[in-house]
């Protein structure tokens, strides 16, 4: 018989667009349910809709979110330094920065994105905040990252700044949205929401997510909860990367 797709997201803005697109393609209420809920609460969804035969978790952010300047996900566009996936909850990144110490911010950059210039970036950003100057736009944060990397040789600086900007925005986004904690909660609840013989696939974007997923799957195979876990990751082809760039 026909399956039923339950789609979860915390981003009401993108969720509405995606639902409209799917409905226009013929996905009616009989085969598609859309819920605004964090996948950390997948147990609540399973209680309402029943357990799942297959779960696909697509982590991180989409190009639609990144390309919207009002969301503040990208250093490439000027906009408010927000970075929240759900703009109805929590505090934006600009507020979060006011409530962390230099050491905490440095730790965040190292743990969430392996930023090699974490100490320099944290120092410059915190100096700016101590002066009473707000760091509330994406362009302002980018400007401070450029300042922090002033000692990088001129020939390498442009590329280094670009990479450090991407890593810094990633680290802040992970922190603002508690992404690692949310992922760990989701992974812990998975065995209880899957039907016997159910399968799970997780699309990870960076090593921090990848480590958590591998650890959880490995532990559950060892405990006899999962029958097996893929030994190798499936990487996107060059063609897929080109289409998504």
Region locations from a protein language model:
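S-adenosyl-L-methionine-dependent methyltransferase catalytic core, i.e., the SAM/SAH-binding region
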Residues: 1-245
